[in-house]
Amino acid sequence: IGFGKNSQEVLIPSFISAYTGKNVQDVGLNPISDKPKINWSIQYDGLTEAFKGVFSRISFRHSYRSNFTINNFQSNLNYNENSFNASGNYESKMFFSNINLVEQFNPLIQIDLELKNSLRLSFDVIKDRAISLSLANNLVTESWGNEYSIGLGYRARNLKLWSRFASNANRFIGDLNTKLDFNIRKNLTVIRNLNIDDNKVSAGQSVFSLRISADYALNRNFSTIFFYDHLF
């Protein structure tokens, strides 16, 4: 008498404890009343002054985001705290279909540098995971993503472009910003069966992307952007 191994009162607290690092004794039986995790974002620019002879900006950034969602839940109209189901266990007060946890370090680390000559360098690392518990078939689906980005940019200040459409002596004067970004992302999905020792890799992907862009401000109200995106 109590709750069986496949009861949601057992699976949900175990799921939350396993994937959040909480002590199972601190996880309640009702996931709706569970406290959300704290999100944060940290940025540090303090090194700019120390290296001001070379860099006009040095910036470090770190951020964490999490979402905990419950899909399709309903009250058990036949619930009675003194009644038992056909297996001799307590009835569930509420029925849940899916429990989902999404976490992102976006970014885990971001380094943004701008030199005195207007050359810009950037480096990003992003890590994320999405975990779903299906109480209909006792399956856990885990998806991980790792992403790495390198960026190179340059700003040409007060660049003059001659055109008969310009009102300022037939020329435009503005900043030309050019940027090149290269990105690598790897995804992996694993399905775990909670009733048997069966873990299967169901999907995986490696994505490489290249983006080249240039934008030019013709005046305060009008600007042009040219870009090229390529996935391979």
Question: Language-model features: where?
Answer:
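Exposed, low-structure sequence patches enriched in small/polar residues
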Residues: 1-232
